[in-house]
């Protein structure tokens, strides 16, 4: 996120905190103060510095993990140094999911040819990642024929009845691509396959569920994947939460990298009958302790009314959590810091009337 975003949000939040009432207009002084905060935000590197400290200095921070504990300590220190008051934590006891070892292999499958069957393709080890909350496979893994679908909608078009679905007894693979969009809207359209695909596949008798990673890396020149080396560099599987229905027997769920999904799609297009083997060893319901981190810019005569701004402090385990949601943490913290510093310099009558409360939330990813 840009510092322009930080400046705009700082201005909006400041005006809300200083506002006289729901229908009140803003005085020239209020508008000038908001504009000055926006100017300071655009000239400041505080958000970038905070993001670097969190994403690079701490890195992955799943709820309850050592990285999460370091992030909680860092956040308290950062908010205090930014000038926020009443910095505190809120303890949360929870049970978390933990990733274990995972592996997947696409096994060679014969295809119809001019003279019977063409030779089988060579087996291919896939870059994969278990979806968050996925159950484990049996100790020796799961192997079955692949039932390929271009989208979740295509799977949903089949009856939720194993006897009437080709998913029955197979590993369902959803090959839904994420469309590139400046506003990230392609992610929203594709993520439903990750959230709902495993339970819908299970309703139809599937023994496991896989999907193309929700993301746009790999497979296109824009992503730096025009060469084999570029494609290999993009062989990264994207994780994220999935969910089960207690009324449906859960099945293992995983994602493969975009280039690996391209290989699966190409072999399907050539008419190959594919077999896939997958093995995962995950843990669920592991007791853990984490914390929300809270800080405030106190109000004056309307201090009991609160303007709440927040982001989530935790991240998944396979990356640094820079965008999700390190950028959010950095932006709201830096914006609140600007307001705290402005309030400290201002006379009492010019301070925000309402309390501005920052909450850096715990366990969003798996909560």
Tell me what each language-model feature is.
Residues 177-179, 215-216, 313-315, 359-366:
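Acidic, glycine-rich active-site loops and adjacent beta-strand->loop/helix elements
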Residues 1-3:
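N-terminal export leaders
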Residues 24-26, 30, 52, 56-183:
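Noncatalytic luminal/extracellular "stalk/propeptide" segments of secretory-pathway proteins
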Residues 25-65, 222, 250-253, 314-315:
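N-terminal capping segment at the start of a domain
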Residues 65, 124-245, 250, 320, ...:
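Extracellular/luminal Protease-associated
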Residues 14-19:
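Boundary at the C-terminal end of the N-terminal hydrophobic targeting segment
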Residues 49, 337-367:
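Short helix-loop-beta-strand segments that form the rim/entrance of peptidase-like active sites
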Residues 31-33, 107-110, 128-160, 164, ...:
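Soluble metallo-hydrolase cores and metallopeptidase-like ectodomains found primarily
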